């Protein structure tokens, strides 16, 4: 959006020129410019030209060339505005605190605002940012030769500063070259993120499918192991919960059987010990019987063993 220049007659008789409705590339909202004045801007000391931003932000400006001739269709007394070449570098000097409290223009801003004055590099001495050489001023007219805005520059240079967005084009003049953005805006692409999410979702679904298949296989194996489930027909539609319930009952029965068998095994061990003791006693008695028979033969006695079964 290009700035609109306005002239207003104040009570003291001085003419105050303001630029308003300026939008930068970063801030789309319009800002008012009103608080900068150059000591050598106008030939007339009563005319004050100031710039100021309402929110105290940075103001972008462009350098264009002003020719002294007239174009076809222009009114008399109006200068022609042409685009300044983009390839030609224009170094500008920035002077801070160009005003004093005596000659400053009253604005709505606070007293703590920082004021800047822009001078071309050709008009600034080496190493000094606040002094200008005495030279003629190149001016551009917008309403007529009466409202001339100038900047202390050598003759023929014809540059001045326009507070506007780089993408906007001045109306009423020839086309000018606009420098492209140094960092073009590129919207973030959501395609990689969508592809990554779909791939992650597919992997998750594959893992879940494998887990369900394993669980189903284990349940089928349980149904084959449990006697009650194996006897039932597959057409009955035995549920997984029913198979698991019968598996739990079968496991409980197996545990009880194992406990009962362990108790019986302990009883068998005890009987085995008792049997060993009795066997040892029988062997001892047999040995004593043989000794007694031997003694009886030694004394001439015949031992007759009678069978009770006869």
Swiss-Prot record:
Lineage per the UniProt record: Eukaryota, Metazoa, Chordata, Craniata, Vertebrata
Domain of life where this protein originates: Eukaryota
Record note on quaternary structure: Efficient DNA binding requires dimerization with another bHLH protein. Binds DNA as a homodimer or a heterodimer (USF1/USF2). Interacts with varicella-zoster virus IE62 protein.
Chain segments annotated as coiled-coil in the UniProt record: none
Domain bHLH: 199-254
InterPro entries in UniProt: bHLH_dom, HLH_DNA-bd_sf, USF
Glycyl lysine isopeptide (Lys-Gly) (interchain with G-Cter in SUMO2) cross-link, renumbered residues: 306
Biased composition (Polar residues): 1-17
Function in brief: Transcription factor that binds to a symmetrical DNA sequence (E-boxes) (5'-CACGTG-3') that is found in a variety of viral and cellular promoters.
Region (Disordered), start-end ranges: 1-26, 171-209
Organism: Homo sapiens
Basic and acidic residues bias locations: 190-209
SUPFAM superfamilies: HLH, helix-loop-helix DNA-binding domain (SSF47459)
SMART domains: HLH (SM00353)
Protein name: Upstream stimulatory factor 1
One GO process term, biological-process aspect: lipid homeostasis
Chain residue ranges for the region called Leucine-zipper: 271-292
Record's keyword annotation contains DNA-binding: yes
